[in-house]
Amino acid sequence: MRCLVLLLGLLGGSALAQTPTPSDYKHPPMPEPMREGKVSVDPAAKFTHFRVGNKNVKSVYIDGTRVWVGTSGGVIRYDTRDDSFKLFDAKSGLLSNGVFYVGRIQGKLTVGTYGGGMSVLMDEAKGTWKTYNIPEGLGDAFIYDVLEAKNGDIWIATWSGANRVRGGALDDRSKWDLYTVENTKGGVPNDWIYGLAEGRNGDIWLATEGGMARFANGKFENWNHARGLGASYDRVKADIAFKNDPSKQSVHHAKQKEEMGLSGVDVAYNPNYVVSLEVDATGQVWAGTWGGGLSRFDGKKWISYTTSDGLPGNHVFMLQKDAKGRLWIGTNNGLTTWEGGKFGKRLSTADGLFANNIFSMAVGAEGDLWIGSFGGVTHLWPSK
């Protein structure tokens, strides 16, 4: 890998400590991010690290020379030209600091938040936002993903169904549709929607807590574990390293697991719980599950991959394709690629990644990667 390093300290005017060697990357909890900071440079180091304190980085978006980082403490805009940055949070116009999605919709920077709806940056210089929430048509104020389809429709993944705004007419309430389990008669398998992607033929894929759904020709079809999604418990039970089991934290998640007949499985395993989604360059659909590994849909059936096949971890939090056609896979145990029908080398903290739990990623114009995890972002250049 060809790399350089640069540390961005969100520490209110004090540079970060010197970077440890790549073989000894251990990052103690950092102070809360502030609005000012300085930059320190270590040309000899392998990776670039951007520390964001005790925060999860759920979304990374590349916008020319700027990198937008969505965290549980707001959105950080970092400019690679001059190493400047700015924090947008509840103090500067967002209705919630928790950010799940950052991207451009209809040319404007758009943020999906945890409980604060969808906010659009109308004037970047002035920092003015316009927010769309339940009164405007959102199914829920918790927004996990947003997609602008080729036909102009805008899809919004919420925790109370999927919104479609026909023609992208966000300010016309009559153009807002909401698809739920109830009004699609089970076509949408679960109202908690975690991801959106567009297929090669314009079909829309939805990742939900109850499986995968596809919207095509005005109708929904869905797949769950019973139809081949996710690896069986017998295949993964010896390697469930990730300990966070949502069923132990909420009645909702416990009910989902019970409905699958998994209430007796006392580990973080639910193959219907799809938390990442991507359509690759060949049109195949990939779904990352909660403990059930990685599943690929070839147009007819689902094929699942686990740690026994070379996947670093069976919890797949992030999927991202690059310009070379590679699929990047972020798991609970590091990062890898899928290329040429096989998994590539595993990258982990031992190689210099900020953390092994990989939640988000964006690919730069030169093929460089910006990888989000708990506590920060790693910037690296993969091998040619």
For the regions a language model picked out, list residue spans one by one.
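Bacterial N-terminal signal peptides
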Residues: 4-14
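Carboxylate-rich, polar loop motifs that coordinate divalent cations or form catalytic acidic clusters
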Residues: 17-384
